């Protein structure tokens, strides 16, 4: 991969932030109703369309 433009870097940064797990305090607060993040993405298995 060559040079990344600033716009592409910004989009990849957003995707990286979205790719985190649900915080433990959210699981406790919702009494384990919310346990998984449907937007989780594996870097090798699925593409980011970038």
From Swiss-Prot:
Q: What Gene3D superfamilies would the database entry show?
A: Ribosomal protein L39e
Pfam families per the record?
Ribosomal_L39
Endoplasmic reticulum: is it a keyword of this entry? no
Task: Cite the entry's keywords alphabetically.
Answer: Ribonucleoprotein, Ribosomal protein
Q: Which InterPro entries match?
A: Ribosomal_eL39 (IPR000077), Ribosomal_eL39_CS (IPR020083), Ribosomal_eL39_dom_sf (IPR023626)
**Sorted alphabetically, which PROSITE patterns does this protein's record hold?**
RIBOSOMAL_L39E
What spans are recorded as compositionally biased (Basic residues)? 1-12
Region named Disordered: 1-21
A GO molecular-function annotation: structural constituent of ribosome
Q: SUPFAM superfamilies in the record, alphabetically?
A: Ribosomal protein L39e
GO CC term, one of those recorded:
ribonucleoprotein complex
Q: Does the keyword Membrane apply?
A: no
Could you tell me the Gene Ontology terms of the biological process aspect for this record?
A: translation
Name the domain of life: Archaea
Q: Which NCBIfam families match?
A: PRK01242.1
Q: Which family does it belong to?
A: Belongs to the eukaryotic ribosomal protein eL39 family.
This chain belongs to the protein called Large ribosomal subunit protein eL39
Taxonomic classification, please?
Archaea, Methanobacteriati, Methanobacteriota, Stenosarchaea group, Halobacteria
């Amino acid at each position: 991969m060559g040079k990344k433009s600033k716009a592409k870097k910004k989009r990849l940064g957003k995707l990286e932030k979205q790719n985190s797990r649900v915080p433990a305090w959210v699981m406790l607060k919702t009494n384990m109703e919310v346990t998984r993040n449907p937007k989780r993405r594996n870097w090798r298995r699925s593409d980011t369309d970038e």
